[in-house]
Amino acid sequence: MMTTPSDLAEFALGFAYTEGLIERRADVYDIEIEPQGHGAAIIVRMTVSSACFAQLKAARRTLLGRTGCGLCGVDSLAYFEQQPAANPNREASRLDIGLLDAVLARFERLQIMRNQTGTTHAAAWVNWQGEVVLLREDVGRHNALDKLIGALLDRDAHPSDGFVLVSSRASYEM
C-alpha cells in the first residue's frame, strides 16, 4: 500500500477495522513497524485474534486499486446492499452551521503536512463544541481516514461524541 510514513500503527488499526477484519481494538494483539533499509519500504506486521485471522482468510476482496469510487476489488454488488447501522445520536442533525464554518476556517491551518507540501488529505475528529480533537494526514484520502479511525480506536472514543471532517470528497465507501 502507498501511504505517508506517519501514524502507521494507527493506519494499520484503522484499515483493519474499516475493512471488517477486526471489530474492536482488543482484536489486535500487536503491531510492529519495520523500516526496510534506506528505501521507502516499511513493513507493518499485525497480530490479530484467531477469529479475525480466520475471517481474513475467508475474505473475497482484493485490496488492489482501493482508491476511486469504492467498487474496485469488490467481489459482488451485494456488498453495497448492506445498510449501515442507524446512528442513534441526534446531535448530528442539530449541527450548528456557524460551528461548522468556524471549524472549517481553522481546518486548513491545522494540516501541517499539507501546509508544507500541498499534497495531502486530512481527516479530523471534531467534538460537538467545535474542537478538533484529532487530525491525521496522508497522501491518500482513504488512508487519512483510516489513520483517524485507528487513532479513535486506540483512544476508545465513542462515535456519538463528535463527527468526522475530511478535506477531500467523501465517496460512497468512506
Protein language model features and the residues they cover:
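Intrinsically disordered, low-complexity regions enriched in acidic/Ser/Thr/Pro/Gln residues
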Residues: 1-123, 127-128, 132-135
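Short, solvent-exposed amphipathic alpha-helical segments in soluble enzyme
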Residues: 5-7, 16-18, 140, 149-154
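Catalytic beta/alpha-barrel core
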Residues: 73, 138, 163
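Positively charged, proline/Ser/Thr-rich regional signature most characteristic
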Residues: 124, 137-144
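Feature captures the catalytic cores and cofactor-binding loops of soluble hydro-lyases/lyases
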Residues: 141-174
